From Swiss-Prot:
Keywords: Cell inner membrane, Cell membrane, Coiled coil, Cytoplasm, Membrane
Listed GO CC annotations: cytoplasm; plasma membrane
Pfam families reported for this sequence: DUF489 (PF04356)
Keyword rRNA processing set for record: no
Cellular localization per UniProt: Cytoplasm; Cell inner membrane
Underlying gene: hflD
Protein family (similarity comment): Belongs to the HflD family.
Source organism per UniProt: Pectobacterium atrosepticum (strain SCRI 1043 / ATCC BAA-672) (Erwinia carotovora subsp. atroseptica)
Record membrane topology: Peripheral membrane protein
Main location: cytoplasm
Protein name (database record): High frequency lysogenization protein HflD homolog
């Protein structure tokens, strides 16, 4: 069956968008709240009608992720900001493989995310309460699966508990996109042998996104 590179590119952009958020938060303590909302909201949509539905049915919501994906695919440097983004992206992919191999962890993840629905009746998605709950799911279910993702940034910024929670919540969103990517036929070999196809798709989607 032919791969749907449009959907695969969307999910990859979702992973890269999470990596971008982690980098921004770790270095500055801040990020674009609209971008963060798209990523965190993707965690809650476990039965989407389509890949794009995971991200609010709007390609524009993944603009940052698509730009980040192009940066990763077009760089050969192993230093600096681009290397950080690549490391976060590939670390998320590696962690998802460990998650997929453990049915108990997958079940627990689904259960914990389901429990958030009650809290969301009373709190906004970007509230400290919900962000902390998402971070706790990452710590309890994902970070126990293997070597922890080493987040690099400003030591002062990373001491802030609210920043830590947002970073972990963004990493959980990255895992969500990685699960989706695998479900729709994504695989590591594509990142080596199908780069031109992924770059073409990402550029075509970005061309449809209005400039702000």
């Amino acid at each position: 069956m032919a791969k749907n590179y449009y959907e695969i590119t969307l999910a990859l952009a979702g992973i890269c968008q999470s990596a971008h958020l982690v980098q921004q938060l770790a270095h500055t303590g801040n990020c674009n709240n609209d971008v963060l909302h798209t990523s965190l909201n993707s965690v809650l949509n476990l039965n989407p009608a389509s890949t794009l539905a995971v991200y609010g049915n709007d390609e524009q919501n993944l603009k940052v992720g698509l730009e980040t994906l192009l940066g990763i695919l077009n760089t050969s440097s192993n230093k600096g900001a681009g290397a950080e983004l690549s490391r976060y992206t590939f670390s998320l992919i590696a962690l998802e493989r460990k998650l997929n191999a453990k049915s108990a962890a997958l079940d627990e993840l689904g259960k914990r995310i389901g429990q958030l629905e009650r809290q969301l009746e009373h709190f906004e998605l970007l509230s400290e309460t919900i962000v902390s709950a998402l971070a706790a799911i990452y710590v309890d279910v994902i970070s126990t699966l293997g070597p922890r993702i080493q987040v690099t940034g400003s030591p002062e910024v990373l001491k802030n508990s609210q920043v830590q929670a947002k970073v972990r919540a963004a990493l959980l969103a990255g895992i969500r996109s990685t699960v989706l990517w695998q479900q729709i036929g994504g695989g590591r070999l594509q990142l080596m042998f199908s780069r031109s196809q992924l770059v073409k798709e990402a550029k075509q989607i970005l061309a449809r996104c209005p400039s702000v």
